[in-house]
Regions:
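Tubulin/FtsZ superfamily GTPase core signature
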Residues: 2-382
Length: 382
């Protein structure tokens, strides 16, 4: 007699022996494999960048890149409350407690305990069609400062696994104001020191430092809301301009993908911008380049004279292009070259735009470790 089994069905040839287990394999339905499409950035860009923000400050930076139009963005944090304030589609809470309480070691251990989950999150948020991933952190807190080095190394491993376009991991580090207290300054000192070591080890490039103390001194009357908007908009907008401009053609002088890659691969990096509405003399352009460097809100206490490579892009409306001699721009670019160390390289680009006047955007790379800034943070922590 054939017995019916609700799982295996009916065996048409039952065996009388108890020594053999013969059965019909059940048909087990498998869930459909829905492949997630690769993210697509909103604007035309030369490089496919991804951004993983850690902590509240790093999360806000990553959110700003998302608002600009970058699609490969994810944010991790030890606190649900902080994640709730970040408007990005990909967010992950790690660790068993809520927040790190400015404790770098606590955040680091929580990250290590969740490392494989974070790798899965990176893959889900960033995908595999990527040139370089940037880690964004605030150096003064607990979560971002605590996980910074380990997150960078994890991203490096992930990039190697998927054969990303670059061997380097980008790092954007927001330094706190010195008035935020000794513990915050201590966290920032340790995090910046580790970040510079990662640059020396050829793991991180570029390292972009956003110095909130510098912003505070340049814009002392900014409201609380506008302060963070200015801080994040400066770095994100300038960064995007260079990544976007390398996709544009120019009949004058083109700043291309390889030019930008050279600066990105040079280590510590800083951006600047200057606008001139009415260009009446050569000295105006040269002065704009100088002021561009002096008033750079991202610079802090970096020694730009140690820079080894730079990009300088001039964008003018048609009227300005018709009126200023080429010699004016050449001399301005040469002045930038003289600002850097001997045998440096300045990659140039000249483009026609719609905004009235002349705008000059700069990116300087290969800058030496900011010893003065490290000393200032160490002193503030004592």
């Amino acid at each position: 007699m054939n017995e019916h089994n609700p799982i295996y069905g009916v065996n048409p040839n039952p065996t009388p022996s108890n020594d053999t287990f013969d059965f019909v394999m059940p048909d087990i339905p498998e869930p459909p494999q829905n492949e997630k499409p690769e993210p697509k950035d909103r604007d035309s860009v030369g490089f496919k960048f991804g951004f993983i923000g850690a902590g509240q400050g790093g999360g806000k930076l990553a959110e700003t890149f998302s608002q600009i139009g970058y699609a490969r963005v994810g944010v991790i944090n030890t606190a649900d409350q902080d994640l709730a304030t970040i408007n990005v589609p990909n967010k992950m809470k790690f660790g068993e407690q809520q927040g790190a309480g400015k404790n770098r070691e606590f955040a680091k251990q929580a990250f290590l305990n969740s490392k494989e989950d974070v790798v899965d999150f990176i893959k889900s948020s960033i995908g595999t069609d990527i040139d370089r991933i940037f880690v964004t952190v605030g150096a003064g807190g607990g979560t971002g400062a605590g996980v910074c080095s380990e997150l960078v190394k994890t991203v490096k491993e992930y990039q190697n696994t998927i054969k990303a376009g670059s061997p380097y991991v980008g790092l954007i580090l927001a330094l706190p104001k010195l008035s935020e207290g000794k513990k915050v300054s201590q966290n920032a000192y340790e995090t910046l020191k580790e970040a510079c070591e990662l640059v020396e080890q050829k793991i991180v490039s570029p390292l972009i430092i956003l110095d909130n103390e510098r912003i505070n001194s340049l814009y002392p009357k900014l409201s609380v809301n506008k302060f963070w908007q200015v801080a994040n908009a400066n770095i994100c907008s300038l960064f995007h301009l260079f990544n976007n401009i390398i996709t544009k053609n120019s009949q004058y002088s083109t700043f291309d993908t390889n030019d930008f890659r050279t600066v990105l691969d040079s280590g510590i990096m800083v951006f600047g911008a200057a606008n001139i509405i009415n260009v009446s003399s050569e000295s105006e352009i040269s002065k704009a380049v100088r002021e561009n460097l002096k008033r750079n809100v991202l610079c802090g206490e970096l020694d730009l004279s140690t820079g080894s490579t730079a990009a300088a892009v001039a964008i003018c409306d048609e009227k300005t292009l018709d009126s200023i001699p080429q010699e004016y721009l050449d001399n301005a670019f040469n002045q930038l070259n003289r600002t850097l160390k001997t045998n440096s390289t300045v990659h140039q680009g000249v483009y026609k735009g719609v905004k009235e006047g002349l705008s000059i955007f700069t990116a300087i790379g290969g800058i030496a470790t900011p010893v003065d800034k490290l000393d200032a943070l160490l002193k503030a922590s004592q």
